[in-house]
């Protein structure tokens, strides 16, 4: 028999650095989840994504057990990392702060496509390119 779901918790946590401190502790504590068990499992699963804040969806069951799914970092974070930036442009229409090649864009698309609402790489590339434009990164051939 399947477990009954109590609810979902969506958080963005620094990969490999989850601690019982806010926002993790209070969010899990409200549902009665074992916080230390989650932080150890999360840190172990995300140690290969260090340096990124990763979205995680935690499914909490009525018996206080849980499962979680770690998603890819946000597209903007991947784009800024590839361009070597700390932040985007304050005026992205006029001030371009970096350039990425089509190959770099496709590398990000291949990593991010599982979280996007499309299976078509061309459509995913347009989505990621739009995110790049909105933070002042120009895509060149």
From Swiss-Prot:
GO biological process, one term: translation
Key words of the record: Methylation, Ribonucleoprotein, Ribosomal protein, RNA-binding, rRNA-binding
Record keyword RNA-binding present: yes
Gene3D superfamilies found in the cross-reference section: Ribosomal protein L11, C-terminal domain, Ribosomal protein L11/L12, N-terminal domain
GO molecular function: large ribosomal subunit rRNA binding; structural constituent of ribosome
Protein modification: One or more lysine residues are methylated.
A GO term from the CC aspect: cytosolic large ribosomal subunit
Xref: CDD domains: Ribosomal_L11
Domain of life where this protein originates: Bacteria
Protein name stated in the entry: Large ribosomal subunit protein uL11
Family: Belongs to the universal ribosomal protein uL11 family.
Pfam families for the chain: Ribosomal_L11, Ribosomal_L11_N
Record-linked InterPro entries: Ribosomal_uL11, Ribosomal_uL11_bac-typ, Ribosomal_uL11_C, Ribosomal_uL11_C_sf, Ribosomal_uL11_CS, Ribosomal_uL11_N, Ribosomal_uL11_N_sf
Known function: Forms part of the ribosomal stalk which helps the ribosome interact with GTP-bound translation factors.
Oligomer and partners: Part of the ribosomal stalk of the 50S ribosomal subunit. Interacts with L10 and the large rRNA to form the base of the stalk. L10 forms an elongated spine to which L12 dimers bind in a sequential fashion forming a multimeric L10(L12)X complex.
């Amino acid at each position: 028999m399947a477990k009954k779901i109590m609810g979902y918790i969506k958080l963005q946590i620094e990969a490999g650095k989850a601690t019982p401190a806010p926002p993790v502790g209070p969010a899990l504590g409200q549902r009665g989840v074992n916080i230390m068990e989650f932080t150890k499992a999360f840190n172990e699963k995300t140690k290969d994504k260090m340096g990124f804040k990763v979205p995680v969806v935690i499914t909490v069951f009525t018996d206080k057990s849980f499962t979680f799914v770690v998603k890819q970092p946000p597209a903007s974070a991947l784009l800024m990392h590839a361009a070597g930036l700390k932040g985007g442009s304050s005026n992205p229409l006029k001030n371009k702060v970096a350039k990425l090649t089509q190959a770099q864009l496709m590398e990000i698309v291949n990593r991010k496509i599982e979280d996007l609402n499309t299976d078509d790489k061309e459509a995913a590339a347009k989505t990621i390119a739009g995110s790049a434009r909105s933070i002042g990164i120009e895509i060149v051939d």
